[in-house]
Regions:
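Accessory carbohydrate-recognition regions in carbohydrate-active enzymes
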Residues: 1-169
Length: 169
């Protein structure tokens, strides 16, 4: 999950100002599970994973449009190249070439409306917006990773999480 920083967001954001505060009293962690309430966005974020996949579950306020910010343009080691693209109505994929080249394949339970880029000086982020996303149903992202190819990232996702719920993972 380190190579693909994903942050659930709402409202207007910029590539230079999107961090959220949180309280340790609204955070919990145990092996295989992490949860935090993001105060700025009013989102409860839950994460779990398998060996080569991540499962994100974001519970937004019912009146908020659901979006995620994907920040693959920087790492501790510097990014040489990156890409993110919509594959189909529910899927996006891409890569980040930093110290190694990691590919990802992400499937959402909401239809993807668009993926747009926000740039502030030299820093650029991607914002994935979801269609008809208001309501209490959480946004769930299943993300497969591979150092070989996007096809392998998809295969890893299908092998490790295909029909599993968040609780099953």
């Amino acid at each position: 999950m380190l190579h693909l920083p994903v942050l659930p967001v709402t409202g207007n954001i910029s590539s230079g100002d999107y961090a959220s505060t949180y309280s340790h009293s609204n955070e919990s962690a145990r092996p295989g599970y992490y949860q935090v309430f993001l105060e700025r966005y009013g989102v409860n974020a839950e994460l779990t994973s398998t060996l080569r996949c991540a499962y994100h579950k974001y519970t937004f306020r019912p009146d908020d449009d659901k979006k995620v910010l994907v920040d693959i343009t920087r790492t501790n080691n510097g990014v040489r190249d990156w890409s993110i693209q919509k594959v189909d109505d529910y899927t996006f994929s891409g890569n980040q070439d930093a110290e190694g080249n990691i590919r990802f394949y992400a499937v959402s339970n909401y239809k993807i409306e668009d993926i747009r880029q926000l740039k502030n000086g030299e820093h650029e982020v991607s914002v994935v917006s979801f269609a008809d996303s208001k309501g209490s149903k959480p946004l769930e992202l299943k993300i497969g990773f591979s150092f070989v190819s996007i096809d392998n990232a998809k295969m890893n996702l299908e092998q490790e999480m295909k029909d599993k719920s968040f609780a099953q993972v």
